[in-house]
Amino acid sequence: MSLIKQHDALLLDLDGTVWEGGRAIDGAVDFINSCALPSIYVTNNASRAPEIVAEKLSAIALKATADDVLTSAQAAVTLAGEHVSPGAKILVIGADSFRDLVRDGGYTVVSSADDQPAAVVQGFDPSVGWEQLTEGALAIRQGAVYIASNLDTSLPTERGLAVGNGSLVAAVQTATEVAPVSAGKPEPAMFVQAAHRLGSTKPLVVGDRLDTDIAGGNAAAMTTFHVLTGVSHEIALLEADVEHRPNFIGESLADMARNANELRPGPQGGFTARVDGLDLLIDNGDADATSIQALRTALEVAWSMPKPPRYIQPVSDKAKEVIQGWR
């Protein structure tokens, strides 16, 4: 049975999974439109309102409304309610749409530490600079609760990995020596909220980043599917901590149409893997075997080792051929 038929909903990451910047990832749109499963796009990118994200999805031919989108900014507003009183002053570091969400949550939005905010919430926005970060830091030093929408250190774009919200949060954390509570992935709350919105009992979490998408799905006790179209690639998978390991691995979203057993870590494509001291050796391989088949073969053995392999050593010519592009 295909992986997709074993589940009743998709909880999809966006950046690096469905698109990069403004460009749809090859095959993603066709697969999502053809799979016939209800989906929610669960994104750590707090720079756009759900309505804007839905418009962007529609622009690449994916049918979506604001109800099909759950952002870390929305999750941050929900989290704020656990820390401050209704109507409290909140200093927002981030996009205008984030400020609107905070206002819609019943809070008073301020922009200066002099306003004595009860909380500082920080989300990604390309325009964030020294002034906003400093006002946030001053407020936190005065006792404001510090909430981050997400802690992704980088953001996939068409030109490569850009600075993410987590890197900007790190500047404030360094200045204040206060670590924020985080609302977004890898915390499980977003996935639980998304599944509840769809009435799903067997959701599949799909993403490209091990430390957010996969870790969050695992924390929510959901099945996870990792794609190689974004941030975390082969070496990251081989070195992944237990809580960051996906149940299934594919090259892209389209692989969800494959038999689930093909997507699990384990021997395939005629490859074999074995431990040699601190190293992992990959051998054999059928003539038409692929890189991802070698990866799944290697993962089963690598994940059984007490520590990540020191070196990945290809033995056969086929193994050398297919793993030369691993990164």
Task: Tell what function each PLM region has.
Residues 16:
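Receiver (REC) domain active-site loop signature in two-component systems and cognate sites
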Residues 45:
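Conserved phosphate/oxyanion-binding catalytic-loop motifs
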Residues 2-12, 20-22, 26, 34, ...:
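Asp-based, Mg2+/Mn2+-dependent phosphohydrolase catalytic module
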Residues 72-74:
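Polytopic endomembrane small-metabolite transporters, centered on the Drug/Metabolite Transporter
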Residues 42:
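Glycine-rich loop-to-alpha-helix module at the N-terminal edge of alpha/beta enzyme cores
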Residues 50-51:
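Switch/connector loops and helix/strand junctions flanking conserved nucleotide-binding motifs
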Residues 37:
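Conserved phosphoryl-transfer catalytic core
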